Amino acid sequence: MSPRIAWALILHGDNPADAGWLRPDEAYRLRKRIETLSDDPDPAVRLQAWLANRADTHHLHAQDVPAVLKDERLVPSGISDPRSQMSAARRGEGYTRTDALEDLTLDHLLVPATPARSNFTLHVTAIMPMRPVPEVLLAADLADRGGPRETIRSGEVFQEWLTHQVGLR
């Protein structure tokens, strides 16, 4: 799924026509795809695949994770969202806009790191999600981490999101 379509799903869920940037045929196809999730035995895996292109992901090392998470140019997500029910005091995750990346990186002395050595996952996108991030975005971020606790919680959050979609209850 392209980033444009993925963000229509993230921000508008079962009403993709509300995304002013989709053509009517794209909104219709996205709505039909969402409807297939109610019959899917593992909708979390499918949604994770659909949302794979939602942002550019940077693995970084932060000197002061709490300070980065408090920065207004960042929206916490994944393990940093309280709804994740994860305890990640020394790690952080969040979204920032493409045009804020350079300043955020400089202000917090964020340096690139391998995924194994990073303590901050920064998702960079042209579309800034609201605070708190939509459930479907939280679930996708948790699924991307791949750990057993994150995977289980991701599935639970995806199910919660599905129950909120009109016509999929």
What residue spans do the PLM features occupy?
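Phosphate-handling catalytic interfaces
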Residues: 4-7, 11-169
